[in-house]
Amino acid sequence: MKTIATGLVLCASLLVHSQTPAPKSAPPKTSPAKPSAAAHKAAPGPRPSLLNPASLTARAPADFKAKFSTTAGDFVVEVHREWAPLGADRFYNLVRNGYFTNAAFFRVVPGFVVQFGLSADPAVNKVWDNAKIKDDPVVQSNKPGSLVFATAGPNTRTTQLFINYGDNARLDGMGFAPFGTVIEGMDVVGKIFPGYRESPRQDLITNQGDAYLKANFPKIDKIKLAAILPAVAPAAHPPSGVKPAAKPSPKPAAKPAQH
């Protein structure tokens, strides 16, 4: 069984494996059954914006939160753009445009990481496969609960992410730059189904999407919805040196006239 105790080489191998291309000895593809007209009508396609990665270039706020509603429960992450600006911007655009809807937690290594970020839609995976962003400097450590982009080498970040289960500080020197952290629901993250570990093949998820996972990994946990939480405005305070207006004293109750 692979564990983090095997050292730096294993950690590098595990995370590089996360985005390696399909092996040459891939099994032959089977032709899926054609969906009925009714089923086709009931399954809308992805947002047009998701099919055009170059259009998703919004700058993320300095700090923001995103809520993940999953089949294991809900958790909230808080992102700090100054930690990794390019990673924060990419994550912000993915969440805002519904990229993670129905995406699976396809790699769960207890004590190490839980990984996700391949779309349930093969058409979306195809266009994002080469939408790489440059690396950010690593300014935060890979502590438990930190949110990080997976990579297959320098400047290869696209859409795959992982949450650290353990203290994986050894990943800091490999270029894995945390840009956020789980602030609510880490217990939920810890309950994500680990039974399949690294069995789901990422090349088949990429090419077949959710159909492959449904057919082969029925217990896999998925993201139902990820959304940016609205910013909470701070309570208003009076200007410095200005005292708040005094509340008027209540008037004494009128006494009944004496007879």
Please name every model-derived segment.
Residues 19-259:
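Cyclophilin-like peptidyl-prolyl cis-trans isomerases
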Residues 1-19:
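Sec-dependent N-terminal signal peptides
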